[in-house]
Amino acid sequence: MLKSVNLKRAFRLTLMTYKLDFKKSALKEWKKLGSTLQQQFKKKLIERLEDPHVPASKLSGADNMYKIKLRQSGYRLVYKVEDDVVIVTVLAVGKRERSDVYRKAMKRSDV
């Protein structure tokens, strides 16, 4: 199930090329993050909504799935790009430890 996010309100921007959606479980993970981590991810998401296809961030073995890394904190955000409907869907947010965040994202992308 997808949860739509109002970007104008969330990021106070008026020009976006892609719409941002969260899987319900990813939104739950997002809300558990501290405000500092959320702000860091928001800044990167704003850039990615302009151009979500970043070759260096593409997940190997997954079509149209990319990651955003916060190196210092060890957190990752995994999203899927749907070009046909111009949507970026956040699939998972979490620590990189044992690659759990990537496994969650792969499962959620199939649902």
Identify the residue ranges that each predicted region occupies.
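Enriched for short, Lys/Arg-rich terminal
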Residues: 2-19, 28-32, 39, 70-75, ...
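N-terminal first-folded block
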Residues: 22-55
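Residues that form or immediately flank small-molecule/cofactor binding pockets and catalytic motifs
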Residues: 25, 61-64, 95
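A short, surface-exposed loop/turn module that caps and links secondary-structure elements
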Residues: 46-70
